Amino acid sequence: MALPEFSMRQLLEAGVHFGHQTQRWNPRMGEFIYGDRNGIHILDLTQTHPMLEQALQVVRETVAKGGRILFVGTKRQAQKPVADAAERCAQYYMNHRWLGGTLTNWKTVSNSISRLKEIDEKTADGSLEGLTKKERLGMERDQIKLQASLGGIREMGGLPDLIFVIDVNKEDLAIAEAKKLGIPVVAVVDTNCSPDGVDYIIPGNDDAARAIALYCDLISRAALDGMSTQLETAGVDLGALEEGSVEEAIAEEAPAAAEEAPAAEPAAEETPAAEA
């Protein structure tokens, strides 16, 4: 495997260059804006391309060292691409709603994850059948709520080593928590956003479905490349694996790697979106 390649044409076709209406711009993004067209800011893809490449490199290196990546995208059009991409590369995601303290109060979040696993086990072994109807319905409601909020991080086993964010305005709390703990942030930053707090900026449209799908696919493939490197370092002969089984081997290796990796300690639609 190798770091994923992408072309300027792919960025154009996905609408990565379309920003927001000119009156909604954030001056902090001025250096990344090429110009405007019909009242819409146009991002400079000659800057986006190398900055996206750098972000992919960081993702690959993080995973190759056994690090965890947390995909964060809770807006409607990002929810499915974020979940699919994270699952494809055996990483983790938050795509429902960012819960305050997810990173800075990890101990409490871990307790909630344990609760979710406990309910899942009781559901699987039939233990819920011995409860009253009211108790059973209460547990089922808790299960649905916890799965939606924490299902994507239930196997993370500790704090992530890097987070990848779609829409820094919407996910400002996640970024603030990551910065407080010194966790690097890779993020897509649109023309109406501030890049403050983002370590690896990807100037680009954060609303168009095709653009979001492209970012998520590239980040996922970079993570897979990193995990491939990790397996090779561990002595796994990837060339001997059957075609199509590399990703399965990577996915099987991920839980063990997550358990072994030391957990950081907390200190604490295809067109420019006018009114996202």
Curated annotation (Swiss-Prot):
GO biological process: translation
Region (Disordered): 251-276
InterPro entries, A to Z: Ribosomal_uS2 (IPR001865), Ribosomal_uS2_bac/mit/plastid (IPR005706), Ribosomal_uS2_CS (IPR018130), Ribosomal_uS2_flav_dom_sf (IPR023591)
GO MF annotations in UniProt: structural constituent of ribosome
Keywords, ordered alphabetically: Ribonucleoprotein, Ribosomal protein
Pfam families listed in its UniProt record: Ribosomal_S2 (PF00318)
Residue spans of biased composition, Low complexity class: 252-276
GO CC annotation: cytosolic small ribosomal subunit
Domain of life: Bacteria
Record bears the keyword Cytoplasm: no
HAMAP family for the chain: Ribosomal_uS2_B
Family: Belongs to the universal ribosomal protein uS2 family.
PANTHER family registered for this protein in UniProt: 30S RIBOSOMAL PROTEIN S2 PROKARYOTIC AND ORGANELLAR, SMALL RIBOSOMAL SUBUNIT PROTEIN US2M
Protein name: Small ribosomal subunit protein uS2
Name of the gene this protein is made from: rpsB
